[in-house]
Amino acid sequence: MPKQKTHRASAKRFKRTGSGGLKRFRAFTSHRFHGKTKKQRRHLRKASMVSSGDFKRIKAMLTGLK
């Protein structure tokens, strides 16, 4: 049986934290900032953690990620 490969698109979008969680970056950050408030833009800069509902599915795609 062949080895399971890491999903490369997911590997570029998620980073593993020291405690074993997954860090992700926010959507809606590429353009059209004139329609967003300063507070929205500030919060979009910060990374957040992957929700518990998505964690199991994403972890399966990142088998080879350390």
Curated annotation (Swiss-Prot):
Keyword Ribonucleoprotein applies: yes
Region (Disordered): 1-20
One Pfam family matching this protein: Ribosomal_L35p
Keywords noted in UniProt: Ribonucleoprotein, Ribosomal protein
Compositionally skewed regions (Basic residues) per UniProt: 1-16
One GO location term (cellular component): cytosolic large ribosomal subunit
GO MF annotation terms: structural constituent of ribosome
Family classification: Belongs to the bacterial ribosomal protein bL35 family.
Protein name: Large ribosomal subunit protein bL35
Lineage of the organism: Bacteria, Bacillati, Bacillota, Bacilli, Lactobacillales
